[in-house]
Each structure stands twice: as structure tokens, then as C-alpha cells.
Amino acid sequence: MEQLPVNVVGWLESLKKQVNDGRKYGVVSHPDSRSLSRSGDVVVKLETAQWNQTAPYNQMLPIIKGQRAYTGCTITAGAIVMRYHKWPNQGTGTIPGYTTSALNLERPAIEWGHTYEWAKMPLVYKTNGYTEEEGKQVARLMLDLGTMIKADYDSGGTGASAYYLATELPVYMGYDKSALYRDRYEYSDAEWQELMKNEIHQRRPVIYSGFNENSGHAFVLDGYTTDSFFSVNWGWGGYCNGYFLLNALVPSGSGAGGNNDHYNFYHSAVTGLMPDQGGDYIESIRL
């Protein structure tokens, strides 16, 4: 074990913990039992938007093979956190345009001739239960975020890295510079859980990412219990939301961009997301 790279060691330890937790809580591999019942009392539960990746969220995105592109899970997770803070009123600077990787789509730059009217972005968009303006407001936010982190729109889904939410939100959206992208393998399980709990306790929902053998997914942690179960907002319009152990992130189904699998590998998180408090950039290196 000592000769293995630290990230591999961290991954193996995470798998070991996942197996042990499964035995402890009686997890079985039946599809009806893929998510655990919540254990412990709720310590903090933040109210976050139950948003998704399709209409109305994607109505300003490019049409690919006759259909609007998905917003992308990373963009949806970022938008959910921004809606929680209701910040900013307007972006700053000019978000540069770019060319997507998969399809070479030319995406135009974003100029700030618009503001965000958070009161017109409801926490839940029910089918035929929102106004045209409410649809436009959330779609505008998704478009801006996608351009900001250079979303790679494709017919099968939209790719983007949560790393760029940490670096670009302070630049264009007035978020604190202390926002940081963190890899789980750099921390012990206890340290990582305490870090996530502290963020939520400080009223900062966490953008969290996990992978399986085929793909990854970004979502939001917005609560936790005394037994270290975390409330997960999967970014699927409320579908599959619930409490999960961080070593057993196995939703009972899948929404837009998902693949009906677990997300237990290669965890990372964006912490410190909050309106500008005068903080400074933090080096993402732990000694």
C-alpha cells in the first residue's frame, strides 16, 4: 500500500469504507434497496431548488439533432447553489465565447445587459405551472453558467468540470475568492465528513461530484444527520433526493444525464461558495 499513489490509496480506502458501511447498515444489492433509510436526527437541512436539466432550464441552449441540449449536471448544481444564495443581482466583466470540444459549436460571449431576478426563479418548476418570465429567468442563468465554465454540449449529455465553478464564480459572479475545489483523496474519511458538515452548518450548500465505472455526476449536499447521512439534491427535479452516506451514493433511479448507477468513486467538492466576503484565494494543496 505504501508504494501506491496517494489517490489510489484513498480510492481503495473509500471502497473499503463503503463495504463496511454496507455491512453495518444492512445494504443489499436489490434495486429496491439501493438507497439507505436515513439514520440519525437531522442537524441541518438547507432548502435548495429542485431543478433539472431539461425545459425550462435549457430553453436558451443549442439544438442538437432536433432537441435542446441538456444544461449539464455541473451547471444545474451550480445554479441551485446560486439560487440558494440569491446572488448576484448581475454578473461582472465579459464572459468570453468558446468552441465546444465534442461538436465544435461556437458559443458567443456573454455581455451583462441583464440582471437575475431570483424571486422569479421558483424552487420548484411544475409542468405548466410557471410563467414565461420564470422560465426565461432560470434559462438565462443556465446559459450564463454554461458559457462561464465552457460546457461541452452534445446530444447524449453535457460535460463540464466543477473545478471551474470554484475559479470562475468569484471572477464573474461576485462569489468569495476562498471558494475551493477539493479532492477527497487528500483527506481522511473523518476529515472529509467534518469539512462537508462545516460547510452545510455555515449555510453553504456543497457542489459534490462522484463517478462510477462509466461516467460522473455533480449534485448538491444540503443537509446532514447525527449519523453522518447527507441530504443529496441530485439535480433531477427532486427525483431520488434523500439522505445517503458519502460512501454509498447510490440513488434509487436516474434522471437527465445519469446512468442508473452509483457515484462512489473519485469524489470531489466545491467548498466556500458564498457571496463575496473579502476572502482571498486558497492554494488547493495540503501538506
Place the predicted regions along the sequence by residue.
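Active-site-adjacent structural segments surrounding the nucleophilic cysteine of cysteine proteases
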Residues: 1-158, 225
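Beta-propeller domains
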Residues: 151-167, 171-182
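Cys-His-centered catalytic/binding microenvironment captured across papain-like cysteine peptidases
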Residues: 1-49, 201, 214-215, 225-287
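Generic structural hydrophobic/aromatic packing signal, biased to beta-strands
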Residues: 73, 145, 169, 208, ...
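Stable alpha-helical elements in mature extracytoplasmic
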Residues: 69, 74-81, 161, 165-169, ...
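Active-site-adjacent substructure of cysteine-protease-like catalytic cores
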Residues: 171-233
